[in-house]
């Protein structure tokens, strides 16, 4: 079954790049802006209540998780009220130890058991929304009064319905490129807003 990327593919690189960018524009127009507002408001609330924000993801989404955490933590470090944001995707020793000893499905949930506290926030980033290690981490968080939010694509998978909040990127199945592109831009957008929000407070 063909998806939109298959349909716009052309051996003419100029045409493909033009149509790819046009498809990204279409996706952006169909994202619910209220869900982005909800995420920003939630992150600010967690900071104001001295709570931690944890980002999790696999593959390209792990890179987005790291970038997101970096932007809002390091980007606000010089101000009075920075964000306590952490990516649980970054420590190779921890990830490989947990994966080796407990299985890949446990690499995030076991970190949350060690670090996360009541009313913290876990943000899961996933194109499919079905990664078992993310689902397990979100289930644990929900059961332990840790707030949850997800960025998803495709049909939203399990995460879309499991998390307390969600930003859904409306792509077709297996369109990883556009899904991860838009997730990264959302991360940049949220980070840009939060940095300026903190600047305005100072």
Predicted feature locations:
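Generic N-terminal amphipathic, Lys/Arg-enriched alpha-helix
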Residues: 1-31
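A short, well-structured juxtamembrane/interface segment
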Residues: 29-49
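N-terminal, charged amphipathic alpha-helical interaction modules
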Residues: 36, 60-61
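Structured helix-beta-strand junction loops
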Residues: 49-50, 162
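Hydrophobic beta-strand scaffold residues
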Residues: 53-54, 148
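Glycine-rich phosphate-binding loops that contact phosphosugars or nucleotide phosphates
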Residues: 61-201
